[in-house]
């Protein structure tokens, strides 16, 4: 619903419905309206409060009507709808037209040619002179007769135009908007976020929006206006609320790696799996999809992201976990050969004392690999061998130690590939190669039609067990590795 801040004789107009209601003169009167449920609709009471406070509230019910035709009132009185308010103000109407032209290539105009009503219409060109928009001359009648009625427009055009028109119709100081991205395709949602935050910045106003759209949020951040995100979750009877401050959000959006990885989209998922490369991301995503379709244990509502290598995985999982998103890392086993494992432990919020001990364990495991594999030419050769043989490259107590260490790491959402590297999964397919030269043949062998006898269904071991373990950590409300 949307209400004008103009009142007369103690009455206000609901700009969406066009109906009058009594405006409470004091806070106590407003309180009585809210508590007197059997006599006054609660929505009316909230609407009255919004009017007094210059609040623009656009909920799901009222927003659907914003592009509809409205009845006109005497032009020398206060406007009774957002259409009439814009019709009376050339500057606001011009801004509406420019906003819609930039968004979808058409100007939104207010057609006054239907007696007693105002309605929106669309045109490719503006009238020859501004006064034509507010006249009923033959030229005006001909112009509007050629315009396209808003009733013929898509729901996205109606929704976008209605919200912009409502926002511009009065000098609101607070905007309350429920799911502003409804009916909008991604680019339009981004443009709406950009427009709303710019308006808020110009007026020193505040936009409070509940959204499930990373595109809308990206548009808000793009405006340069201070944007703060509060991420709310409710799962297994546990509610959480985490704040992502404006400076941190801006930092995330400016980082090319995080921006290209789609980190902002992760805000709208229950969990994330961060992989070393796009090949890993595509493969593990397919494994998870098949688990969800044909078995149990897949990660529900999880997004799969890729870094550039395992060293940059820490740059992604840390900010996600700070936002309360359980972000698991799936990396190749050769991470154990590098001192940089400490960065991954820090990003996973492993306690410092524990991390210190694990750093020493890593060094011992590396020494064990060097002793048993006997690489010929140093670290590059050792890395190749470790990724080729996995944990099976160690025997006896060394094998027990590395398996226990991998289990310890998994408790903090760090999952190292026990077979060495992603290309070693599903050995029964007998695919040799690396990156895309491996991935494409693997997908072909796995099949795309579940009815085909050769289609690869989930099993109990190998990569299927690995992904189930990742999914279990993401789903566990008592998981380790998420800062309080």
Where do the model's predicted regions map?
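Electropositive, glycine-dotted interaction segments
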Residues: 1-81, 297-300
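Switch/communication elements of ASCE P-loop NTPase nucleotide-binding domains
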Residues: 1, 128-265, 463-465, 472-484
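Acidic, Mg2+-coordinating catalytic modules of nucleic-acid enzymes
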Residues: 13, 75-76, 106-108, 260-274, ...
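Short amphipathic alpha-helical segments and helix-helix/interface helices
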Residues: 97, 193-197, 217, 317, ...
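Short, basic, glycine/proline-bearing loop/turn elements
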Residues: 78-83, 141-150, 182, 247-248, ...
């Amino acid at each position: 619903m949307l209400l004008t801040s103009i009142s007369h004789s103690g009455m206000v107009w609901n700009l969406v419905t066009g109906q009058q209601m009594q405006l409470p003169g004091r806070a106590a009167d407003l309180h009585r309206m809210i508590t007197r449920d059997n006599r006054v609709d609660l929505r009316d009471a909230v609407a009255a409060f919004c009017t007094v406070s210059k609040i623009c509230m656009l909920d799901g019910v009222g927003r659907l009507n914003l592009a509809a035709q409205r009845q006109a009132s005497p032009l020398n009185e206060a406007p009774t709808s957002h259409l009439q308010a814009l019709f009376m103000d050339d500057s606001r109407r011009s801004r509406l037209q420019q906003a819609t032209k930039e968004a979808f290539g058409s100007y939104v105009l207010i057609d006054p040619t239907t007696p007693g009503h105002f309605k929106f219409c669309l045109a490719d060109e503006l009238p020859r002179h501004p006064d034509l928009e507010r006249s009923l001359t033959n030229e005006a009648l001909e112009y509007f007769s050629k315009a396209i009625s808003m009733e013929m427009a898509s729901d996205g055009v109606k929704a976008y135009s209605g919200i912009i028109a409502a926002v511009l119709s009065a000098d609101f100081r607070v905007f309350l908007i429920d799911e502003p991205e409804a009916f909008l395709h991604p680019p339009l949602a981004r443009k709406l976020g950009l427009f709303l935050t710019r308006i808020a910045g110009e007026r020193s106003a505040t936009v409070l929006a509940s959204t499930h759209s990373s595109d809308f949020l990206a548009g808000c951040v793009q405006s340069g206006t201070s944007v703060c995100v509060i991420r709310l979750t409710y799962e297994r009877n546990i509610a959480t609320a985490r704040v992502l401050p404006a400076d941190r959000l801006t930092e995330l959006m400016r980082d090319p790696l995080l921006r290209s990885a789609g980190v902002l989209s992760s805000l709208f998922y229950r969990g994330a799996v961060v992989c070393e490369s796009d090949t890993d991301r595509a493969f593990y995503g397919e494994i998870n999809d098949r688990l969800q379709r044909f078995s149990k244990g897949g990660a529900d509502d999880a997004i799969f992201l890729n870094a550039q290598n395992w060293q940059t995985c820490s740059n992604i999982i840390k900010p996600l976990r700070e936002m309360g998103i359980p972000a698991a890392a799936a990396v190749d086993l050769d991470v154990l050969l590098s001192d940089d494992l400490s960065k991954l432990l820090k990003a996973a919020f492993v306690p410092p004392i524990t991390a210190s001990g694990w750093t020493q364990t890593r060094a011992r495991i590396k020494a064990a690999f060097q002793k048993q594999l006997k690489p010929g030419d140093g670290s590059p050769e050792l890395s190749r061998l470790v990724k080729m043989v996995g944990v099976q490259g160690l025997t006896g107590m060394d094998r027990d130690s590395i398996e226990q260490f991998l289990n310890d790491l998994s408790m903090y959402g760090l999952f190292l590939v026990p077979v060495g590297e992603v290309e070693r999964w599903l050995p029964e397919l007998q695919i040799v190669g690396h990156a895309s030269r491996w991935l494409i043949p693997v997908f072909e062998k796995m099949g795309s039609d579940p009815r085909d006898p050769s289609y690869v269904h989930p099993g109990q071991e190998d990569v299927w067990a690995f992904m189930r373990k990742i999914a279990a950590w993401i789903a566990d409300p008592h998981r380790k590795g998420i800062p309080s």
